[in-house]
Amino acid sequence: MTMKEITVVRYGYRLVNSDWAPTVDVDDLGGFVSSLHNDLYSLGITVNYINEPDKELEVKGYADLLNIIRLRSPKDHIGNLCLGHIIGQSENCDLFEDIRRGVTRIAFAPEMIEPEGSNKVVCHNCGCGC
């Protein structure tokens, strides 16, 4: 069986709003992605994690936090889309839940993701250009 590979990438970030902070420890992302990998492996999907701290973005709130998480899936021609582009608006502002939604959307319904460079305005309005 040919495995589908999905990579979760975390960029570095700088909090610029003293009134807001993430409600989860973003450093726990590697363990969470490992758990996702274990859940999806038997279905022919591998999920990997890469930390790219040198690519640093400003984070003012939750929508910006979605922008530091990038998903890649070469088999689906998804090069480096931000999480918000893939899931749209977050339902519960739960980062790990949103990452799971994004990964499973790529895994099982990549045709539902707006193509990179499309003219659609994404409702989370993170400013990433998608």
Where are these regions (language model features)?
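Non-globular targeting/processing and membrane-anchoring segments
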Residues: 1-54, 63-130
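N-terminal non-catalytic structural scaffold regions of very large proteins
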Residues: 57-58
